[in-house]
C-alpha cells in the first residue's frame, strides 16, 4: 500500500477529510471484500501519482460504522470525493 494513503477512522474523519485543504478521495472498504482488494492497486497508483494534489483515504467500515451510516454508504467498495468539506460525488 502506498505511503500516500491515509487511514481514517470515525474520530479522524472530520480532520483528515472534511477539513482537508486538498480534495479527498475516500475508499470505504472491509477486509472481507474481494472487489475492495481488487481496486486497492489503482488507489495506490492514484495516491502516488497525484500526491500533493489529492489525498486518498481509506475507511474500514467494520471498524468505523458511524461515518458510512452518516453518508448513506450501503455497499462496498464505495468511493466518495470530498472537496472543501462538501461531498462532490459518491460511486
Curated annotation (Swiss-Prot):
GO terms for cellular component: cytosol. GO terms for biological process: cell redox homeostasis. Disulfide bonds join 33-36. Residues 2-91 form the Thioredoxin domain. GO terms for molecular function: protein-disulfide reductase activity. InterPro entries: Thioredoxin (IPR005746), Thioredoxin-like_sf (IPR036249), Thioredoxin_CS (IPR017937), Thioredoxin_domain (IPR013766). Keywords: Disulfide bond, Electron transport, Redox-active center, Transport. Belongs to the thioredoxin family. Participates in various redox reactions through the reversible oxidation of its active center dithiol to a disulfide and catalyzes dithiol-disulfide exchange reactions. This is Thioredoxin.
